[in-house]
Structure formats: structure tokens, C-alpha cells
């Protein structure tokens, strides 16, 4: 029956590549996709559209359909730069409406044990932006995990010699949590209570 279906097995394998999707969830999703083909067709069309239209901004490395993105093209405060790990973290900070500066997305966090070194992140691009001389404060908003803390300390060591103020979000956000899952009020309090590194 299904064990001999190469296409079904491939679908299961591809679904399991998504974060948080194990074997059981992949199976449940696959059966749902088969049961509702009209929804599946709309999902496939939406995925195709995203893959062809959405890209990373060449300035901040957030996601956008136009380059540079809306945030980089706006008249936001150019003297303050918030550095986050992932595009979804940018959205979490932006949801608070407490930060009026610009952003820089690293596209990850340092994790030497997993092979994520500074050259694998958008740190060189960050340093180039800072060397332009417009930014006076960098708000480091990496996650409060071992990797996020390591990244924050590494960035602070790289940025401080440039004479730029380096601050870190306050620890009102629980250790080990990801910004995308924290409510806007908590992120806002953390932004307001940020401290020097």
C-alpha cells in the first residue's frame, strides 16, 4: 500500500525537514494534504509565489519583495541599529512599536559545535554598515540561549572599538526562549530596559 509509494515517502521525508515536524506530524500533514486537494493546490501555489517573489533585503537581510525593504527605505532613525538572529525576530521587535531605528539580521547565531562560525553569518555586512559612521548605538537582540549570548559577546567585542554604544535587551525575556514566541509587551519592556555590554 503506502509503503511502496515513492511519492508519498518523499512527501513525508520533505515534511520532516521542517522545524518541529517529526514522523507522526509529517504523516498527519501528508494525510491532510491528500484529503483536501483544493487546499493543497492553494498551498503549493502560495509556496511557489513566495519562492519566486520573496528574497532577503540587500541592506538588513530581512525578508522582502522589494529591495531594499520597506524598513530600510523609510525615514527611520539611522543612528540606532537593532541586530537580531532571524527575520522572525525582526518581526517580534517590530510588533512592539517601541524601536524606531534600523535592523540587521544575522541569519543565525554563533555555534562553533554546529559549524556556525562568524563567516557563516552576516557579521561582515554588519561591520561594513557600522564603518559608514552613521550608527551611534547597536541594540543586540539575539536570543537568550547559549548561542545568542555567545553571539552578543562576540559582536560587542567587534563593535566597541568603533566607538559605538553597544546595548543588550534586558533579561525580562526568559533564558532559553526565542524572541518570536515572546509577547510584544515583554519584548517592549526588554527593549526599554536594555543595558550596556
Swiss-Prot record:
Give the record's keywords alphabetically.
DNA damage, DNA recombination, DNA repair, Metal-binding, Zinc, Zinc-finger
What ranges of residues constitute the C4-type zinc fingers?
A: 57-72
InterPro entries (alphabetical): DNA_Rcmb_RecR, Hlx-hairpin-Hlx_DNA-bd_motif, Rcmb_RecR, Rcmb_RecR_Znf, TOPRIM_dom, TOPRIM_RecR
Residue ranges annotated for the Toprim domain, each copy included: 79-174
- DNA repair found in the keyword field: yes
Q: Name one GO biological process term.
A: DNA repair
Q: Which SMART domains match?
A: HhH1, TOPRIM
Named from the GO MF annotations, one term is: DNA binding
One Pfam family it belongs to: RecR_ZnF
Family to which this protein belongs: Belongs to the RecR family.
Task: Quote the HAMAP family the UniProt record gives.
Answer: RecR
> What does this protein do, in the record's words?
May play a role in DNA repair. It seems to be involved in an RecBC-independent recombinational process of DNA repair. It may act with RecF and RecO.
Name of the protein in its database record: Recombination protein RecR
Corresponding gene? recR
Amino acid at each position: 500500500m503506502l509503503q511502496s509509494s515513492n511519492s508519498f515517502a518523499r512527501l513525508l521525508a520533505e515534511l520532516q525537514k521542517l522545524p518541529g515536524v517529526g514522523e507522526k506530524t509529517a504523516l498527519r500533514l501528508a494525510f491532510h494534504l491528500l484529503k483536501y486537494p483544493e487546499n493543497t493546490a492553494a498551498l503549493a501555489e502560495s509556496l511557489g509565489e513566495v519562492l519566486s517573489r520573496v528574497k532577503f533585503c540587500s541592506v538588513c537581510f530581512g525578508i522582502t519583495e522589494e529591495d531594499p525593504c520597506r524598513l530600510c527605505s523609510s525615514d527611520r532613525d539611522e543612528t540606532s541599529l537593532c541586530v537580531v538572529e532571524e527575520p522572525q525576530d525582526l518581526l517580534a521587535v517590530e510588533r512592539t512599536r517601541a524601536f524606531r531605528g534600523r535592523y540587521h539580521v544575522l541569519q543565525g547565531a554563533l555555534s562553533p559545535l554546529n559549524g556556525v562560525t562568524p563567516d557563516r553569518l552576516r557579521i561582515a555586512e554588519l561591520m561594513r554598515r557600522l564603518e559608514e559612521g552613521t550608527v551611534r548605538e547597536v541594540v543586540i537582540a539575539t536570543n537568550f540561549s547559549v548561542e545568542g549570548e555567545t553571539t552578543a559577546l562576540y559582536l560587542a567585542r567587534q563593535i566597541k572599538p568603533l566607538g559605538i554604544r553597544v546595548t543588550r535587551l534586558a533579561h525580562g525575556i526568559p533564558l532559553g526562549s526565542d524572541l518570536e514566541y515572546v509577547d510584544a509587551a515583554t519584548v517592549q519592556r526588554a527593549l526599554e530596559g536594555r543595558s550596556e555590554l
